[in-house]
Amino acid sequence: MMVIYYLNWNGTMKELHEWEEEQKKMWAKVEGVKVWGIYTPTIPWNRAWLMETDSIDKLFEHSGPRTENIRNTDMVILM
């Protein structure tokens, strides 16, 4: 199953890059979840993570608390 996770960042660019590196390291340890890439669709503060997972439950189980710098999010599940 493929998942597109959109987010609108509300912090500094440095904080965004640090958060993304932490997330990549965390997801690399989760069996059954693969990050295919992080894309900037419109402006630098928007991101779209393309991920593959065995189960949507794995994403929710490991995602942890949301940082205050993420303003809006959307998730699209592609089966």
Task: Indicate residue ranges for each PLM-predicted region.
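Short S/T/G/P-rich N-terminal loop/turn motif that feeds into the first structured element of a domain
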Residues: 1-64, 68-79
